Amino acid sequence: MATTKRVLYVGGLAEEVDDKVLHAAFIPFGDITDIQIPLDYETEKHRGFAFVEFELAEDAAAAIDNMNESELFGRTIRVNLAKPMRIKEGSSRPVWSDDDWLKKFSGKTLEENKEEEGPEPPKAEAQEGEPTAKKARSNPQVYMDIKIGNKPAGRIQMLLRSDVVPMTAENFRCLCTHEKGFGFKGSSFHRIIPQFMCQGGDFTNHNGTGGKSIYGKKFDDENFILKHTGPGLLSMANSGPNTNGSQFFLTCDKTDWLDGKHVVFGEVTEGLDVLRQIEAQGSKDGKPKQKVMIADCGEYM
């Protein structure tokens, strides 16, 4: 019983998908113990589905929430628990989810991904373009001083888009200033995946399972106006729709498969080189090579 809750059925796969792509797409949710892609021996190609086994049932559940009905290589995939005797592609719960896809390979190969989201890009461009002129005056700027191992790596300066997502921006600003009595100082980037993202913000458990917002609980996705268009964008990590706390990630590349699932609320204005140093400490499974810490943080007044 326990095993079945750890094994996922992944259907609707494109021909290009192999075990490496699936590993990269699902590893952000937890440790993977096995991946099987059944072959059609006549064509010597896979049959369009696979099984992914996680070490923990809760990680498998998070993967379902985040990956079901997401895109991989331009195809919408279905992700649900594998049934013991008969594998059905029955839908689990539709979810836009997040941290997910945190899936770099999924996104990297998904450049045609926008076809399905056709109506959205024009809307995003129009709305993103307008507030830009007022950024400097109305939007707060915060910073993080980063330490890698025992050495200072430099400062990352970020502009928070309170003109677009005021509630999300205010949460992050207060966690940088510690004006509510808690925040990011002394916490670490616990998950770093090169060419994808650097995730931090868990200042309670320091492993991706904790953190809290200034609102005392999880808060809703404010909107998805801003998009994951390139490196240096600041976005909320989550465990499904409307589960924002304090965890965040900085993109290392374009990650447009996260659009509509994670709330983008800021961008790096200085210190992209420091972000690249953080990225260099990452690995395919997300475990940092050495500790990457937020030694100090605050707001520019």
Curated annotation (Swiss-Prot):
Catalysis performed (reactions): [protein]-peptidylproline (omega=180) = [protein]-peptidylproline (omega=0)
Phosphoserine carried by residues: S91, S97
RRM domain boundaries: 5-83
One Gene Ontology molecular-function label: poly(A) binding
GO cellular component, as recorded: cytosol; nuclear speck; nucleus; U2-type catalytic step 2 spliceosome
GO BP term (any one): positive regulation of viral genome replication
A Pfam family it matches: Pro_isomerase
Enzyme type, top EC level: isomerase
Keyword annotations from UniProtKB, A to Z: Isomerase, mRNA processing, mRNA splicing, Nucleus, Phosphoprotein, RNA-binding, Rotamase, Spliceosome
Region annotated Disordered, chain positions: 110-141
Top-level taxon of origin: Eukaryota
InterPro entries cross-referenced by the UniProt entry: Cyclophilin-like_dom_sf, Cyclophilin-type_PPIase_CS, Cyclophilin-type_PPIase_dom, Nucleotide-bd_a/b_plait_sf, PPIE, PPIE_RRM, RBD_domain_sf, RRM_dom
All copies of domain PPIase cyclophilin-type, residue ranges: 143-299
CDD domains named in the record: cyclophilin_ABH_like, RRM_PPIE
Domain comment, as recorded: The RRM domain mediates both interaction with RNA and with KMT2A (via the third PHD-type zinc-finger), but has much higher affinity for the KMT2A PHD-type zinc-finger.
Protein name: Peptidyl-prolyl cis-trans isomerase E
